[in-house]
Every structure is written in C-alpha cells, then in structure tokens.
Amino acid sequence: NRPEILDKALLRAGRFDRRIIVDRPNLAGRYQTLRVHTKNIKLAEDVDLHKIAQATAGAVGADLANLVNEAALRAVRLGRKAVNQQDLLTSFELVIAGTEKKGTVLTDTEKRIVSYHEVGHALVAALQKHSQPVSKITIVPHTSGALGYTMQMPEEEKFLSSKEELIVELQTMLGGRAAEQVVFGIATTGASNDIERATELARKMVTQYGMSDKLGLMALSTVSNPYLDGSTMMNCADSTSSAADEEIHKLLMDCYEDAKRLLTEHRALLDEIAMYLLTKETITGDEFMTYVNAENKKLTDGSEPAQDEQDAEAPASPDVPQEDAPSASD
C-alpha cells in the first residue's frame, strides 16, 4: 500500500520489475465476482446479476460477498428457498445505507423537511441532462445516520466525466439544501454530508481537473497515495491557494443558485412529489418519474399549439422567423 516509502535500491531494475495493481473491479469483474459468490446459492428466475453488478459501481469483492450473504439471509427470513432480485437490491441498500432505524421517530415538521430535501435532490437531477436516473427515494431513517436518501443508479459504467456532468452532480448534491431554502426559508444540518461531498468534488474540479475559468489548466494539488486515504497536498503559492478557495466557493454558490432556480420554477411539481413521498415514505424511481413525465407532458402540450392554430396565428410575411417554443428542460 505504500510503495513510495520503499528504499530506491530495492526498486532498481532487475529486482521488482512487475507491479500488480489490485484495484476495485470494473463491471465485468463485479459480475464474475457475483457469479462466484452465488454459485452455491439457489437463485430465482428473475435474478439479473448484470443489473446488480451495474448498480454496485465502486464495490470491492468483500462488499459483494456481504451483499450476497445478506440477500440469502433475507430470503430465509421471509421463508423462501431461493434468492430473488429484490433480495439482492434490498441487501445492496443495506450495505450502503444500513438497516432502518425503527426507533427513530421524527416530528411532522422534520418529516416534511426531509421529504422536500430528498425530492430536491431527485428533481434537480431529473430536470437536467447528464444526470444519473433516480431509482429510489426514502425518508425512512437508517443506521448510517441518514434521515433519508435518494438513490441514483448509473445506466452504464463510465470512466470519464465532462465538466457539464460534474456541474450537474454538484447541483444535485446541493438540491436538498436548495429545497429547504425555497420551501421553508431555512438551512438545516441535514445537508452537512451533501456540502462535504460537494466541496470535495468542487475542489478536485479546480485544483486537479483544470476546470476553473480563472485559474485555467493548472494542477494545484497532488494526491499523496490513492491506495490509502487519497489525501491531497497543495503545491502552489499561498496567494494561488486563496484564489483556488475563492473559485471553489464561487462554483458551489453558482450551482446552489442554479438548483434553487430550478426548484422555484418547478415549485408545484416539488410540492406534489414531496407530499406523495411524505405519505408513502419510500417511492421507486418509476413512481417519481411518473410525476416528472406528466409535468413535462403538460409543459409540452401547453407550449405547442395545434397546427391549425399555428397557421392561423402565423404572420402574413414569411420572412419573419418564429421563435421556438420552450422545451420542458428549459
């Protein structure tokens, strides 16, 4: 784990010529690992290990083994002899978020805030391109410490991210705090982890990825050891470091304002989904997208009049261009 501390003489040519990097498995690796761990377990016909492998991006072999074991235990508890797809998906959530904390009772006000917070995340993601689809939203507290969470499942495994995709990711992370501000005019401690992750991503964009308009193509920090904590060290002047902090703050605030603007423009949809989530406590991505698609259809139908109406309203002169109707994503 610490090759940088080995004696240089030990690493001279002819001694350790081959280095084997044991990294996190990719999609194919996760699928093969799942096959190994499920070979002695009876699986139902609906099990799709490819989908489980796709959903578990970033998981290592031990995580997948734990997932399969939890799925088998769940099947036994429910009196079934075979593990089905829902067992595996539920166990995946158990591994990443912990079990439900049935003893935690939120007040009605807290439940409303958490509901709007989680729908804020999901809605900011769903209203934009370059975002991962929402697969589940819940406001049930879990042992991980979360009072609720919004799960997004990637459609495919990606190894490169564009600046636009990362900005949407930042906006989605800050969508929870934005919803709190838009609806209640307050800021709560529920966004602490969101802000921490957003700040870390924004810092990487500015100091490692060269995505700052002001600082440009400069690597301002280096990763000490990617196989341990992955901590970074700034390798620039103090004044440049201060400028980087300003850029990080500006990037975060711009994304936060964009998230607030989106939620303000779609306030009725935000209210509708938040109330539905408040009633059911947990909804699927399909249920969520039913509301979003219905809203998009209303906007599209309202912005595109029938052809006869368009012809009647068209000016006599063909030289005057007609302004395009706004799309739902705008």
Give short role names for the model-derived ranges:
Residues 19-27, 41, 58, 156-162, ...:
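Flexible beta-alpha connector loops of hexameric P-loop NTPases
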Residues 113-116, 122-330:
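Soluble catalytic regions of large protease machineries
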Residues 102-113:
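Short pre-active-site segment immediately N-terminal to the catalytic Zn-binding motif
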Residues 1-3, 25, 127:
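A short beta-strand-to-loop transition that corresponds to the Sensor-1 phosphate-sensing loop
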Residues 3-15:
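Short regulatory helix/loop adjacent to the ATP-binding pocket of P-loop NTPases
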Residues 8-9, 22-89, 94, 98-99, ...:
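Conserved C-terminal "switch" segment of AAA+ ATPases
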